[in-house]
Amino acid sequence: MRSKKGEEDMRREKRVSDSSVETMHAVRPVHLNGAGRLFGGQLMEWLDEVAGLVGRRHAEHNITTASVDNLRFIHGVYLDEVVVVIGKATYVGKTSMEVRVDTYVESKDGMRRPINRAYFTMVALDEKDKPTEIPGLLIETEEEKWEWDAAKKRREMRMKRREEGF
């Protein structure tokens, strides 16, 4: 499978696994809000960092965050819990890409409970901070194809919202 179906795309392609990133964070007192749970802004920082690392690995350029979709907090996170943040590219355009970031709390026995999922749009920048072309994305599995198709739908919705001034 290829990133551009029906078109000849001469760009070099990279696998999803080439740029995937996983980080872990121990929740400390400095990360907590007044209710004793992980501060949402801290989690957003970790998500953005992982999305940026995925983007940088894929694009091999500096990256900026253009937008975040579907940022939903499913469960709270508490002191001394371990947060696992996993990012991967789901869609690649000419200069931008979508990065899916999943977040889990990992228990002491290694079991992971999902707490968050978000989709970031990242744009690659050249030395003059202008958008620059990036490698294509090689789609190899049915799951990656499903993610690609879903990402295209989300992209269309973002474009429509932009046209509406939102």
Can you describe what each PLM-predicted range is?
Residues 2-5, 11-12, 17-23, 78-79, ...:
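HotDog/MaoC-like acyl-thioester-processing domains
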Residues 16-18, 38, 52-86, 90-97, ...:
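Hydrophobic beta-strand-centered segment that forms part of the acyl-chain substrate-binding groove
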Residues 25-31:
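A short small-residue
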Residues 32-44:
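A conserved, well-ordered hydrophobic junction motif at loop->secondary-structure transitions
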